[in-house]
Amino acid sequence: MRFKPAGRWLQTILLSLALVLCLLRFAFLRADFPNHSPWMIDQAKFTDEGWWASAAVRHFLVGHWRVAGDYNPASVVPVWPLLLALVFHFTGVSLVAARTVNVSFSVASVALVFAVVRRYGGTETTAAVAALLLAASPFAFAFSRLATLDTVVVFEWSLLLWVASYVKPGRRWPIVAMGILIPIMLLTKTTALVLVPAVLWVLWKKSPRAILAVCAMVAAAMGIYVCIVLQSRYATDYHYFYAINALAEVDLASTGSYLMQLFRHGMWVDRILYPAGLAVLLLSLAWLRQLWKNPLFAASWIALAGDAVFVLRRQDDYAPRYFLVMLVPLILGTVLTLQELKVRNRSLAALLAATLTLAIVLDTVQVLGFLSHRQYQFHDAAKSIQAIVDADPAAHRLLLGTSGDQLSLMTGIPAINDGYSNQDLRQKALAYQPGWYVGWNELDQDYMDDLSAFRLDEVANYAVFDREDRNRLKLYRMVPVKEASK
């Protein structure tokens, strides 16, 4: 297909802007998660990076992946810690290295979105718009700079859609690749299961017989992995992970309010793109039904619906990061509609194009605002804690606390968790004898009862982040009561 010079210039401009915005994600990776953002309630900014990386961090700090009685999620989601272990082999334990890997996945997702749109009938301009929307997203920007799992899952899902586009009778490599990639996605994050139906839909549209082969490979791979884990010393950790993540009973009486809450919180994804996407969905159901013949369009809404059902099932127990996997499906559905409207109704196409342009401009301004108003409160607090611990060799060099694993990733000081533990906290504290406790704001009385064998002396107090209940990080020296009484 030949393009007019104006079209080529537009594509070049869009892709150049996307590239610049992607590269900006690598800037200032030591900076804190943005304060006063729409996603300030998300606790991933002070816990999750450390939790998911903990196995790799421990491997290098203490020589083994697992700490008995502690929170060991790698038994269920091993892909990320295995990848970080490879990276840390060259860099050492490093928060910046972990975040760089995550940002790299986010940038690769932008490239994949471009490729996916092209593979499913989108023009180069449509694909470039999709890439720019993802590159400019402040939601993706903020969470891609945390070394958590959601960004990797978005990449894996996009990769699966791209691989699925090559499926056809007689071609084996896409089937084998999907049979491998789906288990990898599920072993990256268990909730990625909600995205699998969208992938299977595309596969069914390409080659119905291929579904059986892919499902058989996925079932075999997951079955073998689970059997191996349950026969190993990681079985307790495996069961504990699912126990603490079990869903609460459904409160049918509150379903209506939860549904309204879900629709309202969709604004976390994007304040313009989200309502535009909902309008596009209604338009496709009422008029542009031709769009549903495109497997990518249907798969996008299946994926979004799958994640929405999962979030709704959690009732009110969820965080903004749970919505991150909605972003790419929303973008794909919107840009494919824009392309269709250019043929069917130029006035509506112009309106949607103007809306997306406004979204890109406002999103870019917000991203630049995050970079220009960056803060290092958590980073500076972590370095101060590291200096205090290093200066007191008499205290056992082991942190205890909910954010202990996060600080371990940031400082290289070993840590254990006080919040998640398959061992009684009192017994664990006596067994491991941590020298330091890190907590947020006021001490929890239940924890204090469990730590009654120690006296907690406050050593430092730091202003960190913007949540009222989590805005003071405190360091305590843990002195055994017997030692203190001498």
Give names to the regions the model predicted.
Residues 100-121, 159, 283:
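Transmembrane-helix motifs of polytopic, lipid-linked glycan transferases
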Residues 4-9, 118-119, 171-172, 205-215, ...:
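Membrane-interface helix-loop-helix junctions at transmembrane boundaries of multi-pass membrane enzymes
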Residues 52-57, 196-197, 203-292:
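Transmembrane-lumen/periplasm boundary regions of multi-pass, lipid-linked membrane glycan transferases
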Residues 37-50, 60-81, 89, 96:
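Membrane-proximal lumenal/periplasmic loop motifs of glycosylation machinery
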Residues 102, 139-152, 319:
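Short acidic/glycine- and proline-prone juxtamembrane loop motifs at membrane-interface regions
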Residues 10-45, 218-233, 308-309, 360-363:
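Transmembrane signal-anchor helices characteristic of membrane glycosylation enzymes that use polyprenol
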Residues 355-408, 414-415, 419:
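Membrane-embedded, lumen/periplasm-facing catalytic core of multi-pass transferases
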Residues 22-28, 314, 337-339, 349-376:
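Transmembrane alpha-helical segments
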